[in-house]
Amino acid sequence: MKKIINPWKGKEGYNCFGCAPANPVGVKMEFYEDGDDIVSQWHLQANYQGWINTLHGGIQSVLLDEICAWAILRKLQTTGVTSKMETRYLKPVDTTDEYVLLRARI
């Protein structure tokens, strides 16, 4: 896997909740290219819980939204914003696990 360099890192005003490394409350995602896939391994943190030992659904949506945006950026060489997102959660994400692995493909 090859790490994707964040083109906005260090730019004035860049404070993305999903991927800005300097955002003190953000999730600070990093991304890698693995063939056709964009991958992120995000380390779970108890301060993002919605319920005891359960990752908040809004944070799960952020992780999904962010990796999709990076797939668009990397594979289509353009940026965009989410206009609609519908999510059905199949099972809870346990915050006592070490990490969650996200993978996106166009």
Where are these regions (language model features)?
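Generic detector of short, locally flexible boundary/turn motifs and exposed helical patches
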Residues: 3-9, 25-28, 51-54, 65-71, ...
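Generic structural "secondary-structure junction" signal
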Residues: 10, 18-21, 46, 50-53, ...
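Non-catalytic linker/capping segments at the edges of enzyme domains
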Residues: 1-47
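A conserved, well-ordered hydrophobic junction motif at loop->secondary-structure transitions
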Residues: 39-66
